[in-house]
Amino acid sequence: MANTTPAVVMDNGTGFSKLGFAGNDSPSFVFPTAIATKSPSAGTGGSGSGRPAVANKPSFLTGGAGPGGHLSAKRGTEDLDYFIGDEAVAAANGPGYGLHYPIRHGQIENWDHMERFWSNSIFKYLRVEPEDHHFLLTEPPLNPPENRENTAEIFFESFNCAGLYIAVQAVLALAASWTSSKVQDRSLTGTVIDSGDGVTHVIPVAEGYVIGSSIKSIPIAGRDITYFVQSLLRDRGEPDSSLKTAQEIKEEYCYVCPDIVKEFAKYDRDRSRFLKHTITQPGGRQVTVDVGYERFMAPEIFFNPEIYSSDFLTPLPVVVDGVIQSSPIDVRRGLYKNIVLSGGSTLYKDFGRRLQRDIKQLVDTRIKASEVRSGGAKSGGLDVQVITHKRQRHGPWFGGSLLGQTPEFRSYCHTKAEYQEYGPSIVRRFALLGGPGGS
């Protein structure tokens, strides 16, 4: 049956998890990667080794499968008393529950909570039997191999899944970009700019393999833009400068401008560019907030970070150029030609156009300097292309959906039989799905 049912695609991020089935255009569920458990006095259990001591699957569903030391053998009512996602956030607002985020900076930190989260995702939300489905999970670049082994132990021993494939998020984001009209060939070589809520990563990928030594992270992402909008509202003394209002303004009105000085002049000449945003406060009272310069100033912190903070001063285009220049020389042309955007903080209007222009200027300046030093030898130039597409927000999930529906996907998965024969270390390596020898 597992050969006929669609694969389950799960992209668990620091902020949000995306769950769904291969072949679909969008995830079935998107909710916070959060879990609410009973306070310690209520006895939530857990093991010091990091392996969970929780029950999730009724014995009549296990068919006797699975060792006695895992979920199916530890059915206590206290182990089932928890919530995930939006329900967890709501439960934590009441008495008796504590809110936890099992993933920090892309890495799973609490395996007990993560197993409970996966269990509810599978049985309560997706409502599938793991024995009948192959699973495609995502991981951040440079994820420790021990994390893969822990994941395999949970999915094979606790959930008894039919097959497991773990893919790097950046590689899946490249696959998601294949839907763009700009992409002529389905290449897994490119530079992925993944900007979510907490951090922005610049990740070079060559033939489906991450160039780990060249990865750079910058401490500017969606949350910083929200804080910046909030500070601008407070400075003006707006009647509502809450974080929620700042986020609404960021998502609804902000865009990237080609030149910040000229944009200020445009606003000063044309007052119609200033907008009004109406908020209904908890008591039912409506207030109006003026929306002005922050429309273009907020996303500008990617390109001129000094307007936000003195802690980090390197513009994103300079970081991207440096990442590619630090990569092996034989793949640099492909990395410049296929710069792929991923994550919610890359969705601003004209973000890709501005990034492409600024990187191109850096490249052209370097080429001209090289031509001068060489005594007049002319360069053939370098193609710089930033790829924007409709699947940017959930790029890794959609890439997993694309690759998970291919006929050969199941042959690339590791199975329960292989896991039992070779042990957890088998998941340290996966054949490259969609790359050389793949689709």
UniProtKB/Swiss-Prot annotation:
Superkingdom of source: Eukaryota
Entry GO terms, CC: actin cortical patch; Arp2/3 protein complex; cell cortex of cell tip; cell division site
Pfam families: Actin
Region (Disordered), start-end ranges: 40-71
GO biological process: actin cortical patch organization; actin filament polymerization; Arp2/3 complex-mediated actin nucleation
Keywords of the record: Actin-binding, ATP-binding, Cytoplasm, Cytoskeleton, Nucleotide-binding
GO-annotated molecular function: actin filament binding; ATP binding
Compartments it resides in: Cytoplasm, Cytoskeleton
Quaternary data: Component of the Arp2/3 complex composed.
Function: Functions as ATP-binding component of the Arp2/3 complex which is involved in regulation of actin polymerization and together with an activating nucleation-promoting factor (NPF) mediates the formation of branched actin networks. Seems to contact the pointed end of the daughter actin filament.
Membership in a protein family: Belongs to the actin family. ARP3 subfamily.
UniProt protein name: Actin-related protein 3
Classification lineage: Eukaryota, Fungi, Dikarya, Ascomycota, Pezizomycotina
